């Protein structure tokens, strides 16, 4: 069962949302967009606001999904997060963290694996 990249990404984000809800996160935003970029998921985990990038792949053949998050991409996520923090006026109310969720889909059936990488990068 193969999909185009956009479909794979959307499916992975759905899996990621379910996964972090089960971990106790509260979803605040999905696909937050602004002129600077996009953040897949923004969630609350205890006293942290967590900005989450989801990467979905069918295999590790080209490395782990998180390896696709270059420094340039991290910087875009960071700047987008700054705008969100300012827009919501939450800079003094929470700690902030950048997590990555890797979703690996099985090409033979509907199974998948999920890996949450907390505090995956800092800028």
From Swiss-Prot:
InterPro entries: Restrct_endonuc-II-like, tRNA_endonuc-like_dom_sf, UPF0102_YraN-like. It comes from the Bacteria. GO terms for molecular function: nucleic acid binding. Pfam families: UPF0102. Belongs to the UPF0102 family. NCBIfam families: PRK12497.1-3, YraN family protein. This is UPF0102 protein CLM_2733. It comes from Clostridium botulinum (strain Kyoto / Type A2).
